[in-house]
Amino acid sequence: MNELPLHLLNMRSLTRDHIEKLIQRANYFLTQGMEKNSVFETLKGHVVANLFFEPSTRTRNSFEIAAKRLGAMVLNPNLKISAISKGETLFDTIKTLEAMGVYFFIVRHSENETPEQIAKQLSSGVVINAGDGNHQHPSQALIDLMTIKQHKPHWNKLCVTIIGDIRHSRVANSLMDGLVTMGVPEIRLVGPSSLLPDKVGNDSIKKFTELKPSLLNSDVIVTLRLQKERHDNSVDIDAFRGSFRLTPEKLYSAKPDAIVMHPGPVNREVEINSDVADNQQSVILQQVRNGVAMRMAVLELFLLRDFRFF
């Protein structure tokens, strides 16, 4: 197994073995921890700082619950009234928090590669990228891979269709990287051409501009919201809704046992119909539940740095 990176900044830094072990450990935390309301002491005495420079409900709260279930102290600085608002640089703030004893820095930022820049400033702490611009969101990809494997355990037989604003989605970037690492043979990207990436970088990834053909024989369908905060208002939402909203009728084109996923937040009746979001094929809430368990596994691994402790 290749050496674990010092920080979790992107999915390409993880090997298939790393991902499989993290899924295995997260499933343990799901069944032996969350379902039994257990609290572990792996992170006892350690401080975790949630540094979210963009709004978040699922990711921030999920990391906080994960850290507390591992016994950590959690710091949620109000960044609007921090020294940053008085002119202190972000990197001086990071060094100050490290001097106070913060070990884990969970970072979400609107600018690409900010977590990487923060990691370069640390003496001994760990940075977990909780989403940077339209670049990467590795913990969400790990959650999605965990959820997929719970329903579809054979990576080499899967067809995964990702629908929506892929060009601006850090979730899509990380998930594509993870699916390629796991050996998924067919990954389909679907949306208007303006919302698809110019290059895909792997032969297993194909682009579609029509929804129904992209759903044929799909095992996994991932819907994504429009990232309106990352581009201008040139996207015609009504046109997008008419062509790319996942409805029960369109879902019939996929395999009967296909699962439907969404990383959230969900914009109902834009990228996904409520009847699909709430039906038996939807695993959206399972993704949320898996989020705490996977983030527990991530925090534990990047502290212990040894799979033998798993």
From Swiss-Prot:
Metabolic or biological pathway: Pyrimidine metabolism; UMP biosynthesis via de novo pathway; (S)-dihydroorotate from bicarbonate: step 2/3
List of residues binding L-aspartate: 86, 170, 225
Keywords: Pyrimidine biosynthesis, Transferase
PROSITE patterns assigned to the protein according to its UniProt record, in alphabetical order: CARBAMOYLTRANSFERASE (PS00097)
GO cellular component: cytosol
Key word Transferase present: yes
Chain sites annotated for binding carbamoyl phosphate: 58-59, 108, 137, 140, 264-265
GO biological process terms, semicolon-separated: 'de novo' pyrimidine nucleobase biosynthetic process; 'de novo' UMP biosynthetic process; amino acid metabolic process
UniProt catalytic activity: carbamoyl phosphate + L-aspartate = N-carbamoyl-L-aspartate + phosphate + H(+)
GO molecular function terms attached to this record: amino acid binding; aspartate carbamoyltransferase activity
EC top class named in words: transferase
Xref: InterPro entries: Asp/Orn_carbamoyltranf_P-bd (IPR006132), Asp/Orn_carbamoylTrfase (IPR006130), Asp/Orn_carbamoylTrfase_sf (IPR036901), Asp_carbamoyltransf (IPR002082), Asp_carbamoyltransf_Asp/Orn-bd (IPR006131)
EC number: 2.1.3.2
Segments traversing the membrane: none
Record flagged with keyword Transferase: yes
NCBIfam families: asp_carb_tr, PRK00856.1, PRK13814.1
Family stated for the protein in its record: Belongs to the aspartate/ornithine carbamoyltransferase superfamily. ATCase family.
PANTHER family named among the record's database cross-references: ASPARTATE CARBAMOYLTRANSFERASE, ORNITHINE CARBAMOYLTRANSFERASE, MITOCHONDRIAL
Subunit structure: Heterododecamer (2C3:3R2) of six catalytic PyrB chains organized as two trimers (C3), and six regulatory PyrI chains organized as three dimers (R2).
Job description of the protein: Catalyzes the condensation of carbamoyl phosphate and aspartate to form carbamoyl aspartate and inorganic phosphate, the committed step in the de novo pyrimidine nucleotide biosynthesis pathway.
Protein name: Aspartate carbamoyltransferase catalytic subunit
Organism name: Coxiella burnetii (strain Dugway 5J108-111)
